Curated annotation (Swiss-Prot):
<keyword id="KW-0472">Membrane</keyword>
<dbReference type="GO" id="GO:0048038">
    <property type="term" value="F:quinone binding"/>
</dbReference>
<feature type="transmembrane region" description="Helical">
    <location>
        <begin position="180"/>
        <end position="200"/>
    </location>
</feature>
<comment type="subunit">
    <text>NDH-1 is composed of 14 different subunits. Subunits NuoA, H, J, K, L, M, N constitute the membrane sector of the complex.</text>
</comment>
<keyword id="KW-0830">Ubiquinone</keyword>
<feature type="transmembrane region" description="Helical">
    <location>
        <begin position="276"/>
        <end position="296"/>
    </location>
</feature>
<dbReference type="Pfam" id="PF00146">
    <property type="entry name" value="NADHdh"/>
</dbReference>
<comment type="function">
    <text>NDH-1 shuttles electrons from NADH, via FMN and iron-sulfur (Fe-S) centers, to quinones in the respiratory chain. The immediate electron acceptor for the enzyme in this species is believed to be ubiquinone. Couples the redox reaction to proton translocation (for every two electrons transferred, four hydrogen ions are translocated across the cytoplasmic membrane), and thus conserves the redox energy in a proton gradient. This subunit may bind ubiquinone.</text>
</comment>
<keyword id="KW-0997">Cell inner membrane</keyword>
<dbReference type="InterPro" id="IPR001694">
    <property type="entry name" value="NADH_UbQ_OxRdtase_su1/FPO"/>
</dbReference>
<feature type="transmembrane region" description="Helical">
    <location>
        <begin position="7"/>
        <end position="27"/>
    </location>
</feature>
<dbReference type="InterPro" id="IPR018086">
    <property type="entry name" value="NADH_UbQ_OxRdtase_su1_CS"/>
</dbReference>
<dbReference type="GO" id="GO:0009060">
    <property type="term" value="P:aerobic respiration"/>
</dbReference>
<keyword id="KW-0812">Transmembrane</keyword>
<feature type="transmembrane region" description="Helical">
    <location>
        <begin position="149"/>
        <end position="169"/>
    </location>
</feature>
<feature type="transmembrane region" description="Helical">
    <location>
        <begin position="315"/>
        <end position="335"/>
    </location>
</feature>
<feature type="transmembrane region" description="Helical">
    <location>
        <begin position="112"/>
        <end position="132"/>
    </location>
</feature>
């Protein structure tokens, strides 16, 4: 009976996290179209429901009702399971992310390592999709995506090593507690170069603009999912947006104090805003980074493939190595309120 009760509570916690996450993914697509529409001086979707609020549901129904066509020369088994391999790591990574104090499915001491592992596993779904499709365009998109993830995973890993050094722990809850205080106590300030490297690497890892060469419509006809349609295409679509939310949430945890208020400890604003739950601050910080994704897409043109590789290997990795040395000096000398 005790085992059944434990399994029931674990399942309940997973559902309480996955269902809102899937809703957030669906409405992020709506937000993207509205925000980019506003930036381009147009309205965006506004016909389905009030102000277009039912547009994601209409899009989902359209994709579900479409036929899933499998190319005649494709590897059928791998072709079908590739979308699942793309979305599962994006959802599984949320198991260790504390959305508020004590609100995590699994509070493990190697949470940071687990996050790095999950973010790098998603590329296997892309690789398998490109190879199983038996299409030269899909294969080219796969090669680009895998090289890009390998290049930027190193820079992202080094950036998160800086967080590990500053917090002295790989437990995400303890990393947030090490940033207890207002906005100037968070790690974004002493780790500013690492923060910027992490964010640029995160955008590149999710294959979003301006690093979306894996889906270069003008070059390789939408890249690795060119042969997918219907529900299987929708799953790839969900995986991309779920990864965007994941990278944004990890940025909020690692550099922006997680559930802490930016005014925590301030003489006047601090007590006035103490009533706001930590989960609200966490969601606001995550939403800020998701808005940055949309802002980048509306602002920057797509980089050339060689420019992306040069940025990853010749700029971001050297910056992280240099700042890790500077951070070591900060820690040894006890610089500022962070160490």
């Amino acid at each position: 009976m005790a085992v059944f009760t434990e399994l029931f509570w674990i399942t309940l916690k997973i559902m309480a996290l996955v269902v809102p996450l899937m809703l957030a993914v669906a409405y992020l697509t709506y937000a993207e179209r509205r925000v980019i529409g506003a930036m381009q001086d147009r309205r965006g979707p506004n016909r389905v429901g009030y102000q277009g609020l039912l547009q994601p549901i209409a899009d989902a129904l359209k994709l579900v009702m479409k036929e899933i066509s499998i190319p005649s020369n494709a590897n059928r088994v791998l072709f079908v399971i590739a979308p699942l391999l793309a979305i599962m790591p994006a959802l599984a990574a949320w198991a260790v992310i504390p959305v508020a104090e004590g609100w995590a499915i699994a509070d493990i001491n190697a949470g940071l390592l687990y996050i790095l592992a999950m973010t790098s596993l998603g590329v296997y779904g892309i690789i398998i999709a490109g190879w199983a499709s038996n299409s030269k365009y899909a294969l080219l998109g796969t090669l680009r995506a895998s090289a890009q993830v390998v290049s930027y995973e190193i820079a992202m890993g080094f950036a998160l090593v800086g967080v590990l050094m500053a917090a002295g722990s790989m437990n995400l809850g303890q990393i947030i507690q090490a940033q207890a205080g207002g906005i100037f106590h968070w790690f974004w300030l002493p780790l500013l170069p690492l923060f910027l490297v992490y964010w640029i690497s995160g955008v590149a890892e999710t294959n979003r603009a301006p690093f979306d060469v894996a889906e270069g419509e003008s070059e390789i006809v939408a890249g690795f999912h060119v042969e997918y349609s219907g529900t299987s295409f929708a799953v790839f679509f969900l995986a991309e947006y779920a990864n965007m939310i994941l990278i944004s949430a990890v940025a909020a945890v690692m550099f922006l104090g997680g559930w802490y208020s930016p005014f925590h400890g301030w003489p006047i604003l601090g007590p006035m805003l103490d009533w706001v739950p930590g989960v609200v601050w966490f969601m606001l910080k995550t939403a800020f980074f998701m808005f940055c994704y949309l802002w980048f897409r509306a602002t920057f043109p797509r980089y050339r493939y060689d420019q992306i590789m040069r940025l990853g290997w010749k700029v971001l990795i050297p910056v992280t190595v240099v700042w890790l040395i500077v951070l070591t000096i900060f820690i040894v000398t006890g610089f500022g309120p962070w160490f």
